[in-house]
Amino acid sequence: TGTFGSSQTFICGNAVKLACDDLKKKMVEQLKVIYDGCTVKEKDHRYYISGGEELELSFKDAARKILFDPKGSVPIGAGTYKALACPNPFSVCFVKAEYHKKLNAIRLMDIIEVVDVGTPINRLTVAGQLEGGIAQGVGYALYERMEINPRSRRTLSTDFLHYRIPQMGDMPRTYVDMVSSHDPYGPHGAKSVGELATVPVAPAIVNAVRRASGIEINSLPLCDKFAILPTERGNVK
């Protein structure tokens, strides 16, 4: 199933979809009991009853009938899902950076990230995931360092007072967008997003800084080689 944190929409979403499909089938069976002797069919979330009575019920009306009719009961759908494939999401990241030679300093100006996560179930949630992942990638590239005592092997970076991460004012102008596609294995065509947002950010930052400065970079964080200038903070779009 891939990384489990990234696969919640893909794995759980498919399980929920199967449970809903099972629920709709059980609603058909319940309506057959209520409308004894009639034929019941479901199509496009509407229920068609023919035979003794000719009725067309919306999903809401069908649910109400099943719940409150003396012959009805509470239908419960169930679904389980084991991934048959792990579809790959894709991302591309662009970074604009400045290099000030006299100060040996860098400033991030803009970050643009575009992703293919299939059909987004909730575009606002996906955008938030991307923005958070970009911030994590900025911290990884510029500041973050896990310090370990070479003798005791104990972690020295034990709190956020001494472990540098980006604040809101440290973030450059950030733009995110989604290219919609349809994955045949995902719930309603969706794929995972998760760590996808973080992965390309540090390489893009390093490439931008290398091209601006002409300095070869083989290690992170960049604060070991350069001073980090405040960003010209803009709105996230």
Regions inferred by a protein language model and the residue ranges of each:
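C-terminal catalytic domains of large/alpha subunits in multi-subunit enzymes
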Residues: 1-237
